[in-house]
Amino acid sequence: VDEERFRTDRQEMSVSGGVEGLQNSHRGRSPEELFAWWRDGAQELAHAALSVDLSKRCAWYGPSMSARSMLTARLMETWAHGLDIADAVGESLTPTDRLIHVAHIGVRAMGFAFVTNGRTAPDEEVFVELLAPSGETWTWGSPNASSSVRGSAYGFCCAVTQRRHVNDCGLTVTGNVAREWMSIAQAFAGPPGSGRAEGQFS
């Protein structure tokens, strides 16, 4: 892991237009070239991940985070943007139990979702119960909590990555805290996302 190179790249990106500047610099590439570029980067990341201490703090574009959290976030982003691509070309993604990583970061980001929307993060716990693609049940929190979110793992992941409007995700949301959370749920870093319109993909 070359942290010095990352810091240099981060500095260059900050003065060259950020993500939008990066996008513009690649707009002339063919789909095949873009895919090869992405694949090379993904393989480099996977190779680096094999040797990193998962508890080690890693520099990032936002606050530093543990290597484990950073890699989980990359899985979440890859899945979410993969769904964007599938939507754009009229295809669908087959859900797998690897969605547990996306769901986990979505649950862990509940407090962040409130803060980034200028709200106070609640002390109250929310129970989350999801049906995995394999039929297994995943849970977070206490089943005795007064607020809960239940449904499919796929629907929950679509909601917390804002790839579908929460009302289109087939979730059962009970309690004031859970309802408020799911209206602003955001697993990704940065300012509040614009999300998707209700019924946009129906």
Task: Tell me what each language-model feature is.
Residues 5-21, 42:
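A glycine-rich, hydrophobic loop/mini-helix early in the fold
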Residues 20-41:
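A short, structured beta-strand-centered segment in the mid-to-C-terminal lobe
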Residues 2-12, 27-28, 36, 51-202:
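Structured surface interface patches that mediate subunit assembly and partner/cofactor docking
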